[in-house]
Amino acid sequence: MIVHSIMEHLILYTSPYPKTRIGRPHDGGYVTVTLPGTYDALLSGGIANDISFEEHFLQLHPIPCYAFDGTIAHLPHANPTITFVKKNLGDSNTDNTTNLHEYMEPYHDIFMKMDIEGHEFRVMPTLQHGLMKKIKQLVIEIHSPGDIRMFPEYFKGLSDIDNRKMFDMLQGINQTHTLVHFHANNGCKIQEIDGIRLPHVFELTYLRNDFVLEKRKNTESLPTSLDRRNIPQNEDYVLSGFPYSTA
């Protein structure tokens, strides 16, 4: 008997290329995949007080970089290789927000990093019409409705985001990209969806589908040896079984 679950949109696959960690050891660093070829731009949404990821990435790939954050006046420290845009990411272009379309248009092999406190549910659905295929690799932190409901004052303007909208967004990403890394943020709680444990906040790494010619489900339990605790003093969440691994 085949049991279908909305969690199938988070099925994790084995990366066909080696992984590495970029950025600082704990929160703010991410596991990425070392892909063949080059990138032509780094677009980074959500900066706050940390550009360790951007600086490390640009040492490896000296390309144009745009960093977006409307909640800060300037970068944590000056870096001439990073163009700072004082705007938040959203579903439209205003004086205070951008949907990234104009920044993506000139490029074809983008590395995108996004940690924008729930507003991923606004901007990502606007990228479907051809723009998603410009993203060679995507690292994104998902702030699930479970977390949004717990902290409504923090996640202002996002009360309409429910599990259906979250999984619709993930299903949309899966049309053009393959999920190859999952890490639970241990600074939050955990919930159950269809009887399956899902952290309130989690980090995902996707590869564009032309780099995944054969999809093989992940066989490792999580976290992996490359992962680091977001909050060093908290234990990491251990995840295995569907949809995380065959283990």
Regions found by a protein language model. Name each.
Residues 63-64, 79-88:
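Active-site regions of enzymes building and remodeling cell-envelope glycoconjugates
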Residues 38-39, 62, 107-111, 133-135:
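A general structural motif
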Residues 1-41, 50, 56, 85-86, ...:
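Rossmann-like AdoMet/SAM-dependent catalytic core
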Residues 44:
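Class I SAM-dependent methyltransferase core
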Residues 112, 134-145, 149:
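Conserved beta-strand signature within the Rossmann-like core of class I S-adenosyl-L-methionine
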Residues 57-58, 73-82, 130-133:
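Short loop/helix-cap segments at secondary-structure boundaries that form the rim of catalytic
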Residues 114-119:
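Switch II (G3) loop of P-loop NTPases
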Residues 49, 67-75:
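Short, polar loop motifs at secondary-structure junctions
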